[in-house]
Amino acid sequence: MENIMKNPIRRLRSGAAAFITLSCLTGPVWAADSIHVRGTVASVEGSAVTIKTNGGKDIGLTIGDDWRIAGVVPASLSDVKKGVFIGTANVQDSSGNRALEVVVFPEKMRGTGEGDYGWDLKPKSSMTNANVEQTVESVDGSTVTLKYKGGEKTVTIAPSTPIVTFADATKDDVKPGAKVFISGTPNPDGTMLTKGFLAVGKDGTTPPM
């Protein structure tokens, strides 16, 4: 299915509450058997949610104890500075590695998904979650050196690159019309997600990852 794709990334740390603050999301938030869903909340009936994917498919989920929810709100290039921990989907072109989007992680989420691995936002894209070691400003944006366990990478962030951060959210933020990014575990026929991580855009924000 378009925009729904397996990705070999890490497992959520479990927690007791269904709807939790970001302080409980400090461990890796991706599950090894997860798929990615990008789309819009089509309907909500109690805990049952239907997502219309960007590819036009419907996929369902029931929000319960196996789900973790985070809000997504705008950030800016000025937030990408030395010492912060970020995640960026990026692609390599003739000029180097170019950011497709950037997530500035709150300090309490430092270390989330650390590393550099394949991603499915664009063909041949990667996700790099790492500490910002150096930034170089220019009229074309900012070039950042990212350091993670076992390696480092230099990525250019253009002024037009979507930049966001995570905020606290609850089930009430998952409402019709909200944009979402989901890393979830599918049932055998792929029509339902049974557990995972749901990032919901707040105040009209689209999760860019």
Regions found by a protein language model. Give the residues of each.
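Sec-dependent N-terminal signal peptides
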Residues: 11-20
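Short, flexible, surface-exposed loop segments at domain boundaries
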Residues: 2-9, 22, 26-209
